[in-house]
């Protein structure tokens, strides 16, 4: 029987095992001023507690809480390859707050999860600065989060992100699609680019094309277009709901599944959609992706937002005032289709 070797007399520390508590504490101190700028009057606690506190009293009569969680997909991989960490946090916030906005809810607070094999304070600070900026631009408080340093779990230089958002809406103003009627009009609001969806396919096309980062796409470098942060629709849409609530029957955030699979999620099961693909011109980056990837139209519609990041389902006689209100806020928009009775069980027709 083999005798086990005697235990080493060299003392070990958590840092020896790959976890640097001091680095984590230094990160917290670095991000505190960024986080504080996002706070709303309802925030009752600072960073560092076991739980973050938010006082909802007095703001709503019958509040309904709406929660959401998301990541940024493999756009994160591209950000890490390019060493661009300061805007991916905006994407993270947008993916969450735009989702809860669909039900007419105001984002209240946000929490993030940042996991890595070895904590790089500068990289983490850059990421969280983007998260804080996204929260500021959405009126949403960044009240907590988790930074997990997990040796051997991630390759050097890589990290993962997740976001969590809680929003609220008056029960009487909740948008759940139940008011949608045949002939309601679809108003598509412009995206800022691919947002945070379809990046596994985007990266494959980009690499197959020779990674042409500096390729001119309508006056912008291709890589800058691909890395443009996801548009934040919260403030303009909440303003629109305040002034035109009766005109909007439902809303949709165009994420994974594209135009084919997202708008239909808020449409009653007995109704369908007819979308006019000629109602707007797809931005050049989507034209490049389709050409370089030899993608069928159907693949484009169910993978990318194709230039439409958010959709309003509106009563027909209110389309003009809604359009004027969107113009006043500088949001490009188009009438892209209607709610219809399905033909031959085809609930979504794009043509």
From Swiss-Prot:
Disulfide partners: none
GO biological process: 'de novo' IMP biosynthetic process; adenine biosynthetic process
Pathway annotation from the record: Purine metabolism; IMP biosynthesis via de novo pathway; 5-amino-1-(5-phospho-D-ribosyl)imidazole from N(2)-formyl-N(1)-(5-phospho-D-ribosyl)glycinamide: step 2/2
EC number: 6.3.3.1
TM region(s), chain numbering: none
Lineage top rank: taxon: Bacteria
NCBIfam families linked to this entry: purM (TIGR00878)
Family, per entry: Belongs to the AIR synthase family.
PANTHER family according to UniProt: TRIFUNCTIONAL PURINE BIOSYNTHETIC PROTEIN ADENOSINE-3, TRIFUNCTIONAL PURINE BIOSYNTHETIC PROTEIN ADENOSINE-3-RELATED
HAMAP family in the cross-refs: AIRS (MF_00741)
Protein name stated in the entry: Phosphoribosylformylglycinamidine cyclo-ligase
Gene symbol of the encoding locus: purM
């Amino acid at each position: 029987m083999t005798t086990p070797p005697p235990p080493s007399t060299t003392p070990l520390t958590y840092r020896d095992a790959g976890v640097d508590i001091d680095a984590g504490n230094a990160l917290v101190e670095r991000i505190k001023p960024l986080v504080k700028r996002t706070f709303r009057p309802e925030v009752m606690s600072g960073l560092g507690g076991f739980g973050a506190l938010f006082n909802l009293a007095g703001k709503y009569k019958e509040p309904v809480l709406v929660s959401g969680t998301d990541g940024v997909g493999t756009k994160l991989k591209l950000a890490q390859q390019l060493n661009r960490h300061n805007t991916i946090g905006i994407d993270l916030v947008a993916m969450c707050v735009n989702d809860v906005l669909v039900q007419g809810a105001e984002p209240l607070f946000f929490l993030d999860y940042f996991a890595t094999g070895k904590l790089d304070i500068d990289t983490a600070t850059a990421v969280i600065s983007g998260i804080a900026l996204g929260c500021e631009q959405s009126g949403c408080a960044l009240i907590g989060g988790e930074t997990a340093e997990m040796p051997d779990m991630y390759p050097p230089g890589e990290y993962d992100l997740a976001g969590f958002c809680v929003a609220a809406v008056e029960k009487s103003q909740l948008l759940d699609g139940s008011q949608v009627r045949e002939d309601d009009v679809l108003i598509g609001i412009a995206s800022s680019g691919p947002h945070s969806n379809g990046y596994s396919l985007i990266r494959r096309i980009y690499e197959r094309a020779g990674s042409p980062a500096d390729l001119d796409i309508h006056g912008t470098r291709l890589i800058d277009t691909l890395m443009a942060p996801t548009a934040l629709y919260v403030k303009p849409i909440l303003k629109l709901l305040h002034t035109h609530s009766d005109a909007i029957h439902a809303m949709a955030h165009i994420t994974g599944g594209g135009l084919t699979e997202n708008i239909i999620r808020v449409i009653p099961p007995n109704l369908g959609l007819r979308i006019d693909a000629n109602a707007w011109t797809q931005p050049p980056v989507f034209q490049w992706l389709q050409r370089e990837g030899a993608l069928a139209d159907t693949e484009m519609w169910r993978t990318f937002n194709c230039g439409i990041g958010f959709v309003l389902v509106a009563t027909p006689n209110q389309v003009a005032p809604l359009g004027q209100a969107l113009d006043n806020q500088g949001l490009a928009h188009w009438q892209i289709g209607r709610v219809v009775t399905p033909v031959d069980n085809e609930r979504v027709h794009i043509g």
